[in-house]
Each structure stands twice: as structure tokens, then as C-alpha cells.
Curated annotation (Swiss-Prot):
It comes from the Eukaryota. It comes from Mus musculus. CDD domains: YfiH. The keyword Lyase does not apply. This is Purine nucleoside phosphorylase LACC1. The gene is Lacc1. Phosphorylated on tyrosine residues. One of its GO terms (biological process) is pattern recognition receptor signaling pathway. Pfam families: Cu-oxidase_4. Signal peptide: none annotated. The keyword Nucleus applies. PANTHER family: PURINE NUCLEOSIDE PHOSPHORYLASE LACC1, UNCHARACTERIZED PROTEIN YFIH.
Amino acid sequence: MAEAVLIDLSGLQLNAQKNCHETLLETLDGIHYHHAPKAKFLCIICCRNASKEKDGEYGLCELEAGNGFSRLAGKFETVSHPCLAASLYTIKQKIDEENLSCIKVIVPEHRKLLMKAYVGQLFTEVYEFEFEDLQGAWRDSLLKPSTGINVTTTQELEDIQHEIETYLRSLPALKGDLTIVTSPLIPDNFLHGFTTRTGGISSVPTLSSLNLFSSSKRRDPKVVVQENVRRLANAAGFNAEKFYRIKTDHASEVWVMGKKEPESYDGIVTNQRGVTITALGADCIPIVFADPVKKACGVAHSGWKGTLLGVAMATVNAMIAEYGCDVEDIIVVLGPSVGSCCFTLPKESAVSFHSLHPSCVRHFDSPRPYVDIRKATRILLERGGILPQNIQDQKEDLDLCTSCHPEKFFSHVRDGLNFGTQIGFISLRE
């Protein structure tokens, strides 16, 4: 049974000669009667700029302004915007507020492909959609559908994409200004930083607002994340078209940019100018690497598994092997991550950190000891030859625990499966 029911009336014209207003209202009453016992959200989509048409036909706004719709005010929410992208995104926000995922869309047959194209852009696989033909409810052709819309060409799909992107660009930033944390260790010929959660448009509470990763298991669609990346690129000064994320596997594979890209990897290295590489983080450590001598850089995603597998030194070693870097020239900066105050592991997993160094584990005798993945990363880097003074793991916001600071950072430990993602990024300036 649907948790939310959306009724698309924006593509219809009303035939005033046949008293179709009452027929439509009766049909809406019937839809409400059928779905109200289970659905938590019932909504009618209208077109704000509809107007009186020729030959006695009226747009839906004419009905909305009349007395007929007033009797439905307590039964349906009405969403009316000049463009369908705005209407559907507004509805998505309302659905997300209620944490709903099963959605029925009652839509005229000639608009079904159109609606599916918008839904495909604005929603993820978290949501389950069912489409029902609205025309089956009409009697005696009292309502006349407008000219058919077929979303079949590349140009039409591009137009939808453009409409959605244009609308998202118009939205205000949430939770304050976009903030980027940087390290004084990284020289100016590199562009780098670590993001916080402010300054984006993501509205789901655990993803708000500068979420920078989309997946089938979360509620932020790719187009919203792309808008967040665009805003970050404008603020930081990099080219969003040359933006590469790690394809996380919680392991130690490193992609050398310019060579064949692996299916998954937790490190990237490059010496290409103007290319921005990024490591994801939401408790795991986003790490950036820079060699100002050989003009090369890298990033790594280091969770507890990747830490033990040596992903940080694997990234360093790739820079040495590919670009002739000297280990003593490489600068390493650890971005915000979960602290030992909040991160625990089963004892059988914590044993490996204790073996690395006892100071990496607190309450070792408990069933779930507290583990310091940042300290473990520093130890492994120093053992690999990175100079202690070339490692930055403590500075203002860089060493804040992501789980302890919900106003600044996303956290899987704190927020569960629908968590947001911040990043560490670096590029060699052009």
C-alpha cells in the first residue's frame, strides 16, 4: 500500500461546457477514500501558470481558485509551481520529512513518460514508485487531456535535465555558508581542503546540507550532489568537470591516474595539473598527500580496515614509484574523522590495533574497545618514512571528532545508514 499518493493534474484542461469540475472533484474524493486509511501524504500537483483557454476549456488553476477545491483542502496538499521540477522537488522534501518511500503517482497516460523522466532524476532507489493511469477515472470524456508529451528524444531528456539543474541552482544554501578547512602544511601551488556539512542544498536531516556522495541506499539523488559539487567548486576554485572521487572498497588499492582505472580503489595519485582528486569521509579519514618537489599529489580513504591494510602508505608508495617522489618530501594531512571517544570495534578486530601499538586502543579488556584510527595512521606513516613534522593530524577543525560535532560534520556512527559524506580534495594548480 502506498505511503504517499501524488495526483498529477497539471497536464489536463477542463471542459466548462460539460460541467467537468464536479466530476473531477468526485474522482478526487474517490481517490482520497481509497488511499487515506494507509497513505500519510496525499498531494495534488497543479500548474501555477495555467489559465483560461479557448473554446470554453480551463486550466486546473481555474478550478483551484474556485469553491470546489476548498472542500478538498483538508484532504490533499496542493503543490503548484511554474515548472514540474520545482513541484516534484518540493514534494520530495515533504516525503523525506515523513521518511516515506512507497509512492503512487496517478498521472494521465500521455504524461507518464514525462513523469518517469523527472522521477528518475530526483529520486533514488530508496523510493519505490507505482504509476497509475489517471484517465481510467474519467467518464464520458468530460476532461480533455492536453497535447500528448512523449519523452523519447535525447533533446527532450536534456531539456528536463536542464530544467532540474536550473531549479536546484536557485535554491538557497542550508545550515550556513560553505566552509572549507585547509592545512598550512600544503604549499600554495596545490589547491586543497576538507569540507564540512554546511553550504549545500541537501535537505534530508542526516544529509543536510553539503552531502557530496549519492548512492542507491541514500535519499540524495545524483543531481543534488552534483549541485553541491558545483557550489564547492565555485567556492574552492577548481573545475567541477575534472573532479574524481575514490571508488571505495575499504581496502588498499591505489589508482594511478592515467593508467587503467580499477573497479574499486581507496587511493588516487596524479601529477596532472587542474585535476581535482577526492577522498570520501564520514568517520573514515580522508587523507591528502602533496609533494611540492616532484609536483605530485594523492588522496586516500582510510577506514579501520583500510588503515590496517596500509592504504596510507600504499598511496605514498605509488607516488614514489610513479613520480620519483622522495618519501621525506611528501606532506600528509589527515582530515576530520571519528575520534577514539566514539569509535569502538569488537575485541577480535581491536587486537590488530593493539598489536600495532597499545596506545591505539582504550579499554582493551572490554568487549568493544575504543580504537584510535588517527594515531594508528600516524604510526604507520612514520614507520614508512614520512617525517613526523610532515604529518598534520591536529589543527582546529581537522582533529574534531565527526561523531561528536553534528553541526559541522556527517557521521555514519552517529546517523546510521542514510549518512552524508564530506570529502578531502587536492589538485595541482594549472
